């Protein structure tokens, strides 16, 4: 195969979005056809720093740790189109102080809450892990009241015995979401039970954009 018709306006886009052009995947780079923005996934943020740990009693905290990370979780204004997606990949360690411990996880773009879910956990001892993966699809762009973002997420946890449970999250924001002003992507966690033995430890977080 040959690389005959690669078009590189993406580098200009990368400067605006703080993305790594070398990290493009999910596209047919080796095709003889010109590359378009369709289905190009570009990493905007990758956590390389220390784990982010949130304990019971800490309040609502962000699992994005921009210190030492690659890229940025800042989304510049007017850099998306109808049909664009944001993708989230996150995993880490989770422990509870007994059964029926609850926490709230929220995904935000600027001031808009794209998803909010209360998760109820069983007794999870040392060695239990979680994954929080999914995407945000932009149905419409523009000002608040016009723009529409829909989230499709899966939060799963696996206990020390290898048993896995899933929460599927499907929510829409068509009131406060907008694409015409700069917005920071955040994912926050807050334990409802304030016992510090409840631990949510984010080990890895990737935030990507699909054009």
Give, region by region, the residue ranges found by the protein language model.
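Sec-dependent, cleavable N-terminal signal peptides
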Residues: 1-2
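N-terminal non-cleavable signal-anchor helices
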Residues: 7-8, 22, 53, 64
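Low-complexity, small-hydrophobic/phenylalanine-enriched stretches
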Residues: 11-40
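Surface-exposed molecular-recognition determinants
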Residues: 38-211
């Amino acid at each position: 195969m040959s690389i005959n018709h690669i078009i590189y306006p993406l580098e200009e886009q990368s400067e605006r979005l703080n993305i790594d052009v070398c990290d493009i995947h999910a596209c047919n780079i080796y095709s003889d056809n010109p590359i378009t923005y369709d289905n190009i996934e570009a990493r905007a943020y990758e956590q390389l720093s220390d784990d982010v740990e949130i304990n019971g009693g800490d309040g609502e905290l962000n699992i994005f740790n921009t210190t030492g990370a690659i890229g940025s979780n800042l989304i510049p204004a007017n850099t998306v189109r109808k049909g664009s997606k944001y993708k989230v990949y996150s995993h880490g360690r989770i422990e509870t102080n007994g059964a029926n411990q609850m926490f709230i996880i929220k995904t935000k773009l600027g001031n808009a809450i794209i998803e909010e879910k209360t998760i109820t956990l069983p007794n999870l001892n040392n060695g239990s892990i979680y994954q929080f993966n999914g995407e945000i699809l932009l149905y419409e762009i523009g000002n608040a009241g016009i723009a529409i973002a829909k989230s499709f997420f899966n939060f799963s946890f696996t206990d020390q015995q290898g048993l896995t449970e899933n929460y599927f999250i499907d929510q829409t924001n068509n009131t406060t979401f907008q694409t015409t002003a700069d917005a920071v992507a955040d994912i926050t966690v807050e334990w409802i039970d304030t016992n510090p033995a409840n631990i949510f430890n984010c080990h890895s977080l990737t935030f990507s954009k699909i054009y």
